[in-house]
Amino acid sequence: MKGKFIVFEGIDGSGKTTQINQLSKWLISTDLIPENNKLVITREPGGTQLGKSIRSLLLDTSIEKSPDSITELLLYAADRSQHVNEIIRPTLDQGDWVISDRFCGSTLAYQGYGRKLDITLIKDLEAIATQGIAPDITFLLDIPIEESIRRRRNRKDDRIEKEGREFLSNVSLGFQALSEDSHWKKISAIDSKEKIISEIKSEIKKLIKNK
């Protein structure tokens, strides 16, 4: 039986890493994942060895000339194609589970709504890169722009995080639009960590029940 593919999305500072860690610990402690199957935690960009090099090209602030918007889009697509073929598809085919910090939603939100690139072009590239692989459920951890800025105040921003408030606002609007899809679940990430993970657990139980 094919494994489950769970994705976490959201603007920077939304708490994806924290909730992924909480969910993974909980899943490992339960019998929701079939016996003899495992849980793989990954991320985009940078989920593979090649992807780590691409991540550096995309996010490194020390690079003198940043990639233009189309180059950036193609690099993300290359990272995703490698990620799907090397990690995600083989893992799911074995019946194992995958939790990914970002997937296609981020490209649509950041490059589509943020960079204002053509959405149809992005979707066409995603179709090539993903080869039909899609999440069983995507959690959008939703926080206001001001909260994102506050949470990131004491950490060093990467190249994307250094974009201005207007860019971040457009990205947030993109995520809001994407979360209307039935496979997305929007969760307020300004609630307590306990409440957030409780909602996530509830949705995972529903996912298993309706399989």
UniProtKB/Swiss-Prot annotation:
<keyword id="KW-0067">ATP-binding</keyword>
<feature type="binding site">
    <location>
        <begin position="10"/>
        <end position="17"/>
    </location>
    <ligand>
        <name>ATP</name>
    </ligand>
</feature>
<comment type="similarity">
    <text>Belongs to the thymidylate kinase family.</text>
</comment>
<dbReference type="GO" id="GO:0005829">
    <property type="term" value="C:cytosol"/>
</dbReference>
<dbReference type="InterPro" id="IPR018094">
    <property type="entry name" value="Thymidylate_kinase"/>
</dbReference>
<dbReference type="GO" id="GO:0006233">
    <property type="term" value="P:dTDP biosynthetic process"/>
</dbReference>
<dbReference type="InterPro" id="IPR039430">
    <property type="entry name" value="Thymidylate_kin-like_dom"/>
</dbReference>
<dbReference type="GO" id="GO:0006227">
    <property type="term" value="P:dUDP biosynthetic process"/>
</dbReference>
<dbReference type="Pfam" id="PF02223">
    <property type="entry name" value="Thymidylate_kin"/>
</dbReference>
<dbReference type="InterPro" id="IPR027417">
    <property type="entry name" value="P-loop_NTPase"/>
</dbReference>
<keyword id="KW-0808">Transferase</keyword>
<dbReference type="GO" id="GO:0004798">
    <property type="term" value="F:dTMP kinase activity"/>
</dbReference>
<keyword id="KW-0418">Kinase</keyword>
<comment type="function">
    <text>Phosphorylation of dTMP to form dTDP in both de novo and salvage pathways of dTTP synthesis.</text>
</comment>
<protein>
    <recommendedName>
        <fullName>Thymidylate kinase</fullName>
        <ecNumber>2.7.4.9</ecNumber>
    </recommendedName>
</protein>
<keyword id="KW-0547">Nucleotide-binding</keyword>
<dbReference type="GO" id="GO:0005524">
    <property type="term" value="F:ATP binding"/>
</dbReference>
<keyword id="KW-0545">Nucleotide biosynthesis</keyword>
<dbReference type="InterPro" id="IPR018095">
    <property type="entry name" value="Thymidylate_kin_CS"/>
</dbReference>
<dbReference type="GO" id="GO:0006235">
    <property type="term" value="P:dTTP biosynthetic process"/>
</dbReference>
